[in-house]
Amino acid sequence: MRTAAAATAVLLTGVGAVVSAVPAQARPADPGVVSYAVLAKGSVGNIVGAPMTWESVSTTPEQNFWVDLPVCNNWADIGLPEVFYDPDLASFNSAVTQTSATDQNHLVKQAIGVFATVDAATRAYHRVIDRTAGCAGQTTAMHLADGTTQVWSFGGAAPTATDAVWVKQEADTDRRCFTQSRLRENVLLQAKVCQSGNGGPAVNVLAGAMQNTLGL
């Protein structure tokens, strides 16, 4: 049996040094940036290298699942109420993009929240990294709102003060979801790429493109 550390190493293959440096000069973002910081399905398709014909956009954080291991909740998906809901949340936007309405061969999710203060955004980021301490190396069932259940194994590198990366792999498949969370000034942005094989480079490009629209 592989150790948890070995399993995490396998999950993280391809992630590497995917976190970009924080610019030396930055200013807080305006709430309106969420309207264009989430990329449209055409741009997403260019990044993942596959046609993406379906998308669903939301202006409120949503969670449509529950997990057996609560410590893995905030790694199971992005754009979650537990992370983003805050009295100082000024604006929010997210989008799910996939191959088609019935095909999730490639599935991408983006989420971004602009907060009234840097402290509020930092609190949201810590609701990701603090509440998932101990999830790396774990396997848990994920129960979806449609009644189906998936089983995922999780791995993640140690987060920094501003960046977190993690991977989950579906049981008995080569399907993995590569995820990044980036804290930039008063913004928390998240990106997730799910596919067979290595989606690490794609999620890094996606998160970088989202960040570039903010000028942060």
Per-segment meaning from a language model:
Residues 1-26:
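Secretory targeting and sorting signals
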Residues 25-97:
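N-terminal "mature-domain start" segment
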Residues 51-53, 58-61, 66, 130-175:
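Short Gly/Thr-rich strand-loop-strand
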Residues 93-100, 176-184:
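Short, surface-exposed beta-strand/loop micro-motifs that present aromatic residues
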Residues 94-125:
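A short acidic-to-branched-hydrophobic micro-motif
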Residues 106-109, 173-179:
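Short, surface-exposed coil-to-beta transition loops
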Residues 108-111, 182-195:
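Short, well-ordered beta-strand elements
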Residues 192-216:
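Surface-exposed amphipathic alpha-helical segments
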